[in-house]
Amino acid sequence: MIGGGVVGAAITRALALRGVAVTLLEAESELARGASGANSGILHVGFDSGPAELETELILRSARLRDPVLDRLGVPVLRCGAVIRPRDREEADTVAALKANADRNGVEVALGDDGALEVPGEAVTDPVAYTQGLAALAAAAGAEVRRDARLEAIEPAGDRLILQTGDGDRLDCSLAVNSAGLRGDEVARFVGDDSFSIYPRKGEFFVFEPPDGESLERILLPVPTKRTKGVLVFPTVDGKWVAGPTAHDQEDKDDWSVRDGAFDEVMSKARAMLPALEGAEPIASYAGLRPAGRGCNYVIGPSSPCPRLINVAAIRSTGVTASLGIADYVLGLLADAGVEPRAEREPPAGAPVPEPADPWWLRAGRREARA
C-alpha cells in the first residue's frame, strides 16, 4: 500500500481484517500529512453527488459502512447535520434540483417551508484521528505500517513487483496499490503509466473561537457551483468554528501556505451565511491541497502498463468521506487480480487507537509553517 492518507489507511485496514498480508508505506514521519490532514473533516452523505459516477457510488457505499467503523475507532464525531439556505430565485431552483438529486441517490433530506434544504446525515470528524485510527486497527490485525518510507522506484519482476524505498529497502510483493494522493501520478510513472496527471487545488481555511453567546448547531453549506461546493462554515469536534475553503489551482505540490487575500475571499462569503462572524479574528489558519486530476476524477483500477499496480488516484475532495467505500471497491479489484481475502473478522479486542494530542486544524497549520 503506497500512501498513508485516509484512503490508504482504509484499504490497509480492510485487507488486514481479511487476513491479507499488507504493508503500508508512508513517505512522511506520520500519517495524514497531506490532503487527508488538511481539509474540513466533514463526512458527506452524497446528497449532491452526480448520478452514474463512481465517486457517487463510493460515497454512498461509504456512508452505509461508516457508523460501525466510527464507533469502533472511538474518534470524535459531531453528527450535526447540514443546511443550505438559498438567497434568491435562481439559488432556490438549484436547491430544488439538489433535493431531487438526493432523492435519486436515496439520501434523506428535507426541504423546509423557507426553501432551506436540511441534510441530517452530514457529520464532522477529526480527519487525522480517523486516518491514524484506521491504520492502528490495521496494524493490530497484522498489517505493517512503515513511516519515513518514501518510494523511489517500482521494478516489475515477472509476477512480482519490487518496491524500493529511499532508505534502501526493497520490498517484494505480488500487487501494489497506489494511493499516494498528490504524488499518485509520479508513482504511476515509475511503471511507465502517464495516463493521468495530478495537480494541487488549494483550499484555505480559517479557525475561530465562537463569539460569546453565539452557537453554530449545523454545517452551513452554500448553494454549490459547477466548479466547487464553495465556502462552508462548520463547527469542529472541539468546539471551534471554521470557514473555508477557497479553490485555487496551482502547480507547486509543496506550497501549503495561506495566500495573501485568502481571508477576505473566504470571509466575504462566510459572513453572508453567518453574520456572527462579522469582525471576528481567526485564531489559526491552514491550507490543504486537493489532489485534482486533469480532466479526470476517481481514477481507480489496474495500471495499463503494469496491471499489478492498482491506481487509486484523483480523489480530489471526498477522500475522508468515501474512504471506506473506496476500500471496499478496491477489495473487489484485488480479488479479480488473484488476492483471496477471507471474510472480515473483528479487530483484536483492545486494539490501540491513538488519541492525538492536538486538534487536527492546529496540526494542519503546522504543515503550512513547515512549508
Predicted region positions:
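Helical element adjacent to the flavin cofactor pocket in flavoenzyme catalytic cores
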Residues: 121-175, 183
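Short beta-strand to alpha-helix junction loop
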Residues: 50, 57-60, 85-94, 117-137, ...
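Helix-loop-beta segment of a Rossmann-like dinucleotide-binding subdomain
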Residues: 74-84, 108-141, 162-163, 246-254, ...
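C-terminal catalytic lobe of FAD-dependent flavoproteins
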Residues: 127, 133, 228, 237-238, ...
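Dinucleotide-binding Rossmann-like beta1-alpha1 core, especially the glycine-rich loop
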Residues: 41-118, 230-231
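Flavin-dependent oxidoreductases
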Residues: 10, 154-159, 163-244, 248-261, ...
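N-terminal Rossmann-like FAD-binding beta1-loop-alpha1 element of flavoenzymes
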Residues: 1-24
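Glycine-rich FAD pyrophosphate-binding loop
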Residues: 17-38
